[in-house]
Amino acid sequence: MQVFRGIEMPYVNIKITKEGATKEDKEKLVSGVTQLLADVLAKNPATTIVTIDEIETDNWGIGGELVTERRKRGV
């Protein structure tokens, strides 16, 4: 939770692999997460901050292996 000039500002950071999420996909993520915080936690959508970081698959590992290599195997 961020506080700016006494106003609580929920902050959500979404990290996804950089594999073709469109602007429309990202708009849906931002809208959906904002609405979820409003519905579940009664947070004000006007002060909710959502950021999306797209990480190259060469910079993301799962189970000791780069996502790039996992994708080559269809995992």
Feature annotation, model-predicted:
Residues 8-23, 27:
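N-terminal acidic leader/helix
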Residues 4, 14, 25, 42, ...:
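Short, intrinsically disordered low-complexity segments
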Residues 47-49, 54-73:
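C-terminal structural segments of small proteins and small subunits
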Residues 20, 42, 61-64:
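Glycine-centered flexibility sites
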Residues 25-53:
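Amphipathic, hydrophobic secondary-structure cores in small proteins
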Residues 1-8:
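Short, Lys/Arg-enriched N-terminal segments with co-localized hydrophobic residues
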Residues 18-20, 70-75:
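Short, surface-exposed, charge-dense and proline/glycine-enriched linear segments
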Residues 11, 22, 39, 66-67:
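General helical secondary-structure elements
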